[in-house]
């Protein structure tokens, strides 16, 4: 008789290929055989990071628009919205993490690979503006393939707009914490992902600009086994810490407590 649960679904682990029952992935979505971390949805990430019932979404009316008339983009947006239950690739709100208040922005790679576009840009701008207005720390959890090609230069301009707003945030005592999760690539890694006062990489995350396959097709080089990994970035001083997923919440809570900004501003 099989020792696996009788009901539920199975999935092949993207890394080791073993078949894993949905219950075996556990709360933190980790393969029990090779310890590969599944990519989380926004809902899963919020459940793991914030104090229960504390997340309050910011009011945001920005919606994606097919400004360039890109073929089939509108249909792809509708499909992504239907499959994820989101209307864009980032969710922003106020939250408590270990009883420490903050503004939290969480990107979702399940929505068109979490790509940066006009609507995502405006939401991140609003999150930073609210951090300044409410005198709260800002945490951005990145999960993105980069800029959204269907919005062309509009998506690229978003990189600079976000950097300009984060410069205004940096002129205040308010901290910016970036949490780099799998994947953090392209225009997101090239712009705001590494602008944090504290930069945390989730263990196992792939972080870089161009993907390894693109680089190897362009340059006749053999890339190291740990290329574009969280551990490699830590070894080279690009991130402040590599944290396992189960420890992320307590790590962020301790960091917020050390800064002491949100609690002092809100009693």
Swiss-Prot record:
EC primary class: transferase
InterPro entries found in the cross-reference section: AcCoA_carboxyl_beta, Acetyl_CoA_COase_Trfase_b_su, ClpP/crotonase-like_dom_sf, COA_CT_N
Pathway assigned in UniProt: Lipid metabolism; malonyl-CoA biosynthesis; malonyl-CoA from acetyl-CoA: step 1/1
Catalyzed reactions: N(6)-carboxybiotinyl-L-lysyl-[protein] + acetyl-CoA = N(6)-biotinyl-L-lysyl-[protein] + malonyl-CoA
Start and end residues of each CoA carboxyltransferase N-terminal domain: 9-267
Enzyme Commission designation: 2.1.3.15
Gene3D superfamilies, alphabetized: 2-enoyl-CoA Hydratase, Chain A, domain 1 (3.90.226.10)
Subcellular location: Cytoplasm
Binding site for Zn(2+): 13, 16, 31, 34
Keyword field contains Lipid biosynthesis: yes
Family note: Belongs to the AccD/PCCB family.
Protein name as catalogued: Acetyl-coenzyme A carboxylase carboxyl transferase subunit beta 1
